């Protein structure tokens, strides 16, 4: 809250442009994973926090965004790498049929932070290779 109050109090410079708060959550904010309920609940809580911040801060000129990474190749996914390699190769869970990388998430965050979506707030950007698509 202290950081938000400061962001509101200090007007943006011409160079920095619009200010943004970016929450990094996970597709687990909406996708159930029965073996990781605590993780899913925490991400879903952050997702609602982002939505509430967006609603509350819009009039203050602060845009709030949420990035939901999908299956990203990191140390956190190392234990399930073989399983996900197989599922990704089959094309059943990731339509783009590849792992996501931290750089994919970083590029999304950079676009939001640079004000590329200045007339958007509360935007949820899934960086998931299409995992959000409903398919038969």
Language-model segments: which ranges?
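Residue(s) in the substrate-gating loop at a strand-loop-helix junction
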Residues: 26
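Active-site helix of classical SDR
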Residues: 42, 50
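Alpha-helical segment proximal to the catalytic Tyr-Lys
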Residues: 5, 55-56
């Amino acid at each position: 809250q202290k950081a938000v109050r400061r962001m509101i109090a200090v007007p943006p410079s011409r160079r920095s442009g619009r200010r943004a708060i970016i929450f990094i959550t996970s597709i687990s904010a909406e996708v159930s994973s029965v073996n990781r309920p605590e993780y899913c609940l925490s991400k879903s809580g952050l997702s609602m926090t982002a939505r509430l911040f967006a609603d509350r801060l819009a009039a203050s000129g602060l845009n709030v965004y949420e990035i939901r990474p999908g299956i990203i190749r990191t140390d956190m996914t190392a234990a399930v790498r073989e399983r996900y390699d197989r599922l990704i190769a089959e094309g059943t869970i990731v339509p783009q049929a590849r792992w996501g990388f931290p750089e994919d998430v970083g590029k999304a965050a950079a676009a939001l932070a640079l004000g590329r979506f200045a007339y958007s707030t509360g935007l949820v950007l899934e960086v998931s290779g299409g995992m959000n698509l409903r398919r038969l």
